């Protein structure tokens, strides 16, 4: 007897496009829980700099896949895929519809398309050596080892740069050539969110981020885990760290973070258009358009 595939709803879009707010409204309407697919929100204490759903928002709607690990841990896409798939299957076993929200294209596609990279365990000695080299030299190495990947990830993304070098040094092959696909047995509805005023939204969010605590948040992380944490080299935290060290003025930190975030958002948009091809929601009535598409998928 034919068994229809279970539905999994996905909302993707660039950073600062309003995924969290829209996602919560959708979740309320359909009585859904939310699975956050974000490469930084899965770490504890990184709240302001990652625009993590607030405690109030988490009380309104149950959120999964956030605050899972210490910032000193390094979870790769393969590990996240395994954690997320278990979380999704738990919901499916309860006859609920999983709802995934995120802007991390690599992590999202590892889940919904079944892409996975070689399962190379963390190499502590190698990682330590790469961290001592610094991101600039590691990036130059990566351009030699895996030029394909350097066109897909942010040059300031130390976590993914080191992971890619780690895989290359262990296997002798670039990570971009070792990805395989094993699609999960789900029916995927992909909704895309993009705002025409995204640059203005990014500037406003970055300004608020610095005004409302990313510097204090960064200080606390440094005090507990040290200043060499790879996650502190990601957008926002790197600039906050430079303010703390008095290497940057606050205004310049906001400017640099805004520019980096706009560049990152452009790459996200390109990724989603090329790799995902979602149903892009109508900006004039996002919630209504999302509801119509979800109801259609539920028929």
From Swiss-Prot:
Quaternary state and partners of this protein? Monomer.
PANTHER family, from UniProt? TRNA DIMETHYLALLYLTRANSFERASE (PTHR11088:SF60)
Extract the HAMAP family matched here: IPP_trans (MF_00185)
Q: Where is this region: Interaction with substrate tRNA?
A: 38-41
User: Residue numbers for the site described as Interaction with substrate tRNA?
Assistant: 104
Q: What is its EC number?
A: 2.5.1.75
What cofactor is this protein dependent on?
Mg(2+)
Q: Specify the protein name.
A: tRNA dimethylallyltransferase
In this chain, substrate is annotated as bound at 15-20
Q: Where does ATP bind?
A: 13-20
Report the catalytic activity.
Answer: adenosine(37) in tRNA + dimethylallyl diphosphate = N(6)-dimethylallyladenosine(37) in tRNA + diphosphate
* Listed NCBIfam families: miaA (TIGR00174)
| Main enzyme class | transferase
Q: Could you tell me what this protein does?
A: Catalyzes the transfer of a dimethylallyl group onto the adenine at position 37 in tRNAs that read codons beginning with uridine, leading to the formation of N6-(dimethylallyl)adenosine (i(6)A).
Q: Which Gene3D superfamilies match?
A: 1.10.20.140, P-loop containing nucleotide triphosphate hydrolases
GO biological process per UniProt:
tRNA modification
Query: Which family does the similarity line name?
Result: Belongs to the IPP transferase family.
Q: Which InterPro entries match?
A: Dimethylallyltransferase (IPR039657), IPT (IPR018022), P-loop_NTPase (IPR027417)
Q: Does the keyword field hold Zinc-finger?
A: no
This chain's source organism reads: Prochlorococcus marinus subsp. pastoris (strain CCMP1986 / NIES-2087 / MED4)
Q: A Gene Ontology MF term for this entry?
A: ATP binding
Keywords, alphabetical: ATP-binding, Magnesium, Nucleotide-binding, Transferase, tRNA processing
């Amino acid at each position: 007897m034919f068994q229809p595939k279970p539905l999994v709803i996905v909302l993707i879009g660039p950073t600062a496009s309003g995924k969290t707010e829209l996602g919560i409204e959708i979740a309320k309407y359909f009585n859904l829980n939310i699975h956050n697919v974000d490469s930084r929100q899965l770490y504890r204490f990184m709240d302001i700099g990652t625009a993590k759903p607030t405690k109030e928002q988490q009380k309104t709607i149950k959120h999964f896949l956030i605050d899972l690990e210490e910032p000193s841990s390094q979870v790769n896409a393969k590990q996240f895929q395994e954690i997320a798939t278990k979380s999704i299957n738990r919901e499916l076993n309860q006859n609920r519809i999983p709802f995934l929200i995120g802007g991390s294209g690599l992590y999202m596609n590892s889940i919904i398309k079944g892409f996975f990279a070689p399962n190379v365990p963390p190499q502590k000695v190698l990682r330590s050596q790469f961290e001592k080299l610094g991101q600039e030299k590691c990036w130059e190495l990566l351009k030699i080892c895996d030029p394909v990947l350097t066109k897909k990830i942010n040059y300031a993304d130390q976590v993914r740069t080191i992971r890619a070098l780690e895989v290359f040094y262990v296997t002798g092959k670039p990570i971009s050539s070792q990805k395989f696909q094993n699609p999960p047995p789900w029916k995927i509805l992909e909704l895309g969110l993009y705002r025409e005023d995204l640059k203005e939204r990014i500037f406003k969010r970055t300004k608020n981020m610095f005004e409302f605590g990313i510097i204090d948040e960064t200080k606390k992380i440094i005090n507990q885990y040290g200043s060499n944490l790879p996650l502190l080299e990601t957008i926002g935290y790197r600039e906050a760290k430079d303010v703390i060290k008095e290497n940057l003025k606050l205004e310049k930190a906001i400017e640099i973070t805004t520019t980096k975030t706009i560049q990152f958002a452009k790459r996200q948009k390109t990724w989603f258009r090329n790799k995902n091809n979602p149903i892009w929601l109508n900006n004039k009535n996002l919630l209504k358009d999302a509801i119509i598409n979800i109801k259609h998928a539920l028929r």
